[in-house]
């Protein structure tokens, strides 16, 4: 008889575990989310035991009926882990034995270890979870694309080093936030190639001697393939680290978008206004409208980076094969998914609800002498070496700055004094509209290019949705 109630081991021990060990080992408070996957795997395992001749038809059918009943009770919340259950596996075995008896219920464990079991369940859960995250990321992409379509001709100051640089289209800038998220979703699609390998049948580490068929088990569980090496299958968690990286990267990309929104909605920038439903107020300052969603996006990005770093640190020095350290592999990943499932719809709603101050952005677009590059490139088109053109444009900025005027306000005489090549025809490029329209090379900010970029973003988003449905 086991000396360890609620666990799957104990016969070798003359005494049960200490209370401190039980408390330390317990994982049902976080691994219960794997319960539906555990039952699904147990159904497939029951059928595999039958095919291997280890169960007769009556035993197979009895186990499957018990598992079906247990699944219903788990789904409606009438079956939950007890304080004595060590983990999700122990809790579900207890529930099954309660329904079919110890003799029949005790047969299910043949040929499997918690090592291959949990590695498989984690992969099953994660393959579903990444699809939910990807769908949320694509909702943010849609919101960015819709705003870009709405503002196809809106001009704004483009910045580098947070200093005014060149005029660009707002659509161009918004789509620049969409592309990283599309790459993140592409990583999720690619990730599945490595996650979709079943460890089931690997046992504790050495494989099974009971005539089980890992390939058939993999197929039953929706995996394209079974693992090639049972030691690697039970010990590897690079799939979890890869997912944690993608989650952290999504959070970082959202954080960069959030930072723009925080700046744009400030009084000093005044580019955008927050919708009442997607912002908060102050407990003491009545006038405040705070970008809490964006600020929480910044904060949560740090949390997800920490989850990735913590998981990698857990993995870094473990010898093969399985070690109990791997109990710590799931919480960081579970948390990252949970945070993104909160954050992504909030960010999509925030972006979709932004109202842009088109007039202010247009007025600020030439500020900071953002047309200086256009002067230099106009001179290059006249045959002037770029080094000389750059010098002349810089001098024009210094002269205009000294007079407190814009580049377009310099007189013909002042321009000629700077460089004989600066004829009155240079005024063709001294408008923000002309500057933006001239950037018509692939990927540029010209309206024609921004329209193509919008088409590409929407097409890529639709293609990724189709891939995620496979």
Swiss-Prot record:
Which Gene3D superfamilies does the entry mention?
Fumarase/aspartase (C-terminal domain), Fumarase/aspartase (Central domain), Fumarase/aspartase (N-terminal domain)
Q: What is its main location?
A: cytoplasm
Taxonomy, superkingdom: Bacteria
Protein's cellular compartments:
Cytoplasm
Species in which this protein is naturally found: Mycobacterium leprae (strain TN)
Q: Does the keyword Amino-acid biosynthesis apply?
A: yes
Q: By which gene is this protein encoded?
A: argH
Q: How is this protein named in the record?
A: Argininosuccinate lyase
Biological process, per Gene Ontology: arginine biosynthetic process via ornithine; L-arginine biosynthetic process
Task: Describe the reaction catalysed, as an equation.
Answer: 2-(N(omega)-L-arginino)succinate = fumarate + L-arginine
